[in-house]
Amino acid sequence: MEVMNLMEQPIKVTEWQQTYTYDSGIHSGANTCVPSVSSKGIMEEDEACGRQYTLKKTTTYTQGVPPSQGDLEYQMSTTARAKRVREAMCPGVSGEDSSLLLATQVEGQATNLQRLAEPSQLLKSAIVHLINYQDDAELATRALPELTKLLNDEDPVVVTKAAMIVNQLSKKEASRRALMGSPQLVAAVVRTMQNTSDLDTARCTTSILHNLSHHREGLLAIFKSGGIPALVRMLSSPVESVLFYAITTLHNLLLYQEGAKMAVRLADGLQKMVPLLNKNNPKFLAITTDCLQLLAYGNQESKLIILANGGPQALVQIMRNYSYEKLLWTTSRVLKVLSVCPSNKPAIVEAGGMQALGKHLTSNSPRLVQNCLWTLRNLSDVATKQEGLESVLKILVNQLSVDDVNVLTCATGTLSNLTCNNSKNKTLVTQNSGVEALIHAILRAGDKDDITEPAVCALRHLTSRHPEAEMAQNSVRLNYGIPAIVKLLNQPNQWPLVKATIGLIRNLALCPANHAPLQEAAVIPRLVQLLVKAHQDAQRHVAAGTQQPYTDGVRMEEIVEGCTGALHILARDPMNRMEIFRLNTIPLFVQLLYSSVENIQRVAAGVLCELAQDKEAADAIDAEGASAPLMELLHSRNEGTATYAAAVLFRISEDKNPDYRKRVSVELTNSLFKHDPAAWEAAQSMIPINEPYGDDMDATYRPMYSSDVPLDPLEMHMDMDGDYPIDTYSDGLRPPYPTADHMLA
C-alpha cells in the first residue's frame, strides 16, 4: 500500500500549488474569499480554504482511515495549517486591508504589490519543500521493508519494478536519507546490481548507488554493503549510463570514503579502469583519469599496474588528441604522479609524452600549464636523447621571463636536463637567447636555490662541448652574469649550488676574454677559500677512519676537485697564475697529489703544471717535495695525469745538476715518452694541455664537472610520493559532496 502511495505522491505538490492562491491574495491582488466583518464570516473563509486543500490532499493519504475520524483530524490540521501559512506570508494584513495593496504600476518601477510578492514567493517555495520533505521521508520509511523484500524476489520483473521505485526515491533528498538509513535495503540493491543480467535493472541499481554517494552516510552504507567490488564489476557493462553511474560512484567513494582506495585496488579496479581510457567521451574520461590519480598517488604498486595495462600510452594519447580543459588537467595530474616512478618515466617518454605535454605549455589554463611543466621537469632526466623537442625548448626559454616561482623552477630544471650531453639542444637553446634568459632568472631568483641551482647547471652545460659553447661563454660576460655567478660561491649557499657554480666558472675560464672580469670579481680567493675548507673537512674524516659523508648530497672531495680544476684553467692567465701562487696554495696542491681519487690527482698535477711555468713557483713546488709523488704519477693509468706530472718534473729539473736531470730524463723516457713523442714535445715546450674532461663517470666517484649531470626528479610538486599539495577540482578546495554532474560542468 505504501509503495502504491509513492507513485501518487507527485500529484499532491501540484494540486497544493494550484489551490495555494486560496490561502493568499498575493497572486490575484485580492482575497479569493469574500471578506466579512463578522468573526463567523472569517471562520467560514478559513474553513472554506482549508476544506478545498484538505479535499485534494486526503485523496492520497487518508486511505484506510475511517471517514468520520479521518475527516475530523485532517480538517483540524489543515485549517490550522492554512491559517499559519496566511499569517506567515502576509502578517498583519486582514481581508479589509488587502485592497490597499492594489496600486497603479508605474513603468520601470515595482509596485507595492510586487515588492510584497517577493518574500511571499520565497516562503511559498520553502513551505512546498518542507511539506514534500516530511512526506517523502515518512513514505520512504514505511515502504522500506516491502521494497527490500521485493528486491530479493525471485521474479525478475518484480525486482526491476522495485528497483525503479527505489531509484525514484533516491532522487529526492528526504527519501534518499531514509534509504541510506537502511543497511538491508542498500545491501539488497548491491546484491541485485551484482546478480542481474537485465540492463534496465543494472541501470536503476547503479543510479541508486550513484544518488546515495552524494552523502557521507550513503558512501558509508555502500562501502559496508560490499558495493565497491560490485561497482568495479559494472565497469565492464556495455551500457554507457551504467558505466557513468559506476565510475562516478567509485569516484565519490575514492574522494571521501576511508578505505575505499584499498578496496578498489583489491577488487582489481585499476585493471578495469585503464582500458576505459580508450572511450571517447571527454567528460567520462575526466572522471576516469581522476580515479586513476587518486589510486596511483603515493602507491607504487598502483603505478606499476597502470604501466602493465598500457596506461602511459593511453594517457599520452589523450593529451595529444583532446582539447577539453578538465580532461587535459586530470590527465596531466595522473602523468605527474607517474612521472616520479622510474618504471613509468621511460614508457611515458617513449610514447611521446614530452611532445604531447609541450603542446599545452601555451594553454590559457594556468593549472594545466603548471601540471605540464612539473611533469616535463620530472621526465626530463630520461628524455635527454629525445628528438622533436625544439618547440618545447623555445617555450621553456620564454617561460624564464615570468615571475612565478613554480614556473621558473620547472623551466630551469627541464632546460638543465634537456641540455645534458645533448649538443643539438645546447646549440638550440644558446641560439634562442637561452643564456641571457637564464642569467636574468638567476638575478631575479634571489635566495631560491630551487631556481638558481638548475639555472646554473643549465649554463654549465651550455658553456661546454658544443659548437656554440664559446658564444655561450661570451654571452655570460656580455650579459653581466659573471659578478652574479661568482657571488653564488659565498656560504651559506647550499653545496649543490656551490658545486654547480664552480663547474660553470671552470667553463667560463676556458674563454680568455673572461679572465679579467673573473679576476675583478675576486673569484680566485673565493675558490681557494672553498678549497681549503673542503680539503680540511675531507682530511678530518680520513684521519678518523670514517667514510666521507655527503653534505646535501655533495661530498667534500667533489668540491676539492672542482675548485682545483677551476684554478687550473684560470692559471693559464699570467695575472691569475701569480695571484694563485701568492695565496700560498702550492703546499696544498702538492698534498693533493697523494689523494686516493684519480680525478683529484689529475687536476692537482694540472694546476702545478701551469704554475711551474714561473721559476719562482717551480722552485716552491720542488721545495715542497713534489718530485716523489710526481715520479709515482708518471705511471698513472690516466694519461692526462701522467703528462701533467712529466711536464712539472721536466720544468723543475731545469736548474738541477746534470745527474739529477739525467735521472729524471731516464724515468720520463721509460715511463711515458718512449711510445709518445707528442707528450715528450709537450712537456719540453710546456704547451698547455687542453684535454677535455671526459663524459664517463668513474665507477666509484662522480667527477665534479667531467660531464653534464642530469638533475634527479624534484621531490616537490610532483607526487608526494614525494610531493605535492593535494590538487583539487576547483581552484579552491574540493566541493564537500559533488552533485551528480559535478565533473560534467
From Swiss-Prot:
Expressed in the heart (at protein level). One of its GO terms (cellular component) is protein-DNA complex. Changing residue 19 to A: Reduces glycosylation. One of its GO terms (molecular function) is cadherin binding. ARM repeats lie at residues 132-171, 172-215, 216-255, 258-297, 298-341, 342-381, 383-420, 423-464, 470-510, 512-551, 574-613, 615-661. The modification N-acetylmethionine is found at residue 1. The keyword Hydrolase does not apply. GO terms for biological process: bundle of His cell-Purkinje myocyte adhesion involved in cell communication; canonical Wnt signaling pathway; cell migration; cell-cell adhesion; cellular response to indole-3-methanol; desmosome assembly; detection of mechanical stimulus; endothelial cell-cell adhesion. InterPro entries: ARM-like (IPR011989), ARM-type_fold (IPR016024), Armadillo (IPR000225), Beta-catenin (IPR013284). The entire ARM repeats region mediates binding to CDH1/E-cadherin. The N-terminus and first three ARM repeats are sufficient for binding to DSG1. The N-terminus and first ARM repeat are sufficient for association with CTNNA1. DSC1 association requires both ends of the ARM repeat region. It is linked to Naxos disease: An autosomal recessive disorder characterized by the association of diffuse non-epidermolytic palmoplantar keratoderma with woolly hair and cardiac abnormalities such as dilated cardiomyopathy and arrhythmogenic right ventricular dysplasia. Arrhythmogenic right ventricular dysplasia, familial, 12: A congenital heart disease characterized by infiltration of adipose and fibrous tissue into the right ventricle and loss of myocardial cells, resulting in ventricular and supraventricular arrhythmias. Belongs to the beta-catenin family. This is Junction plakoglobin. It comes from Homo sapiens.
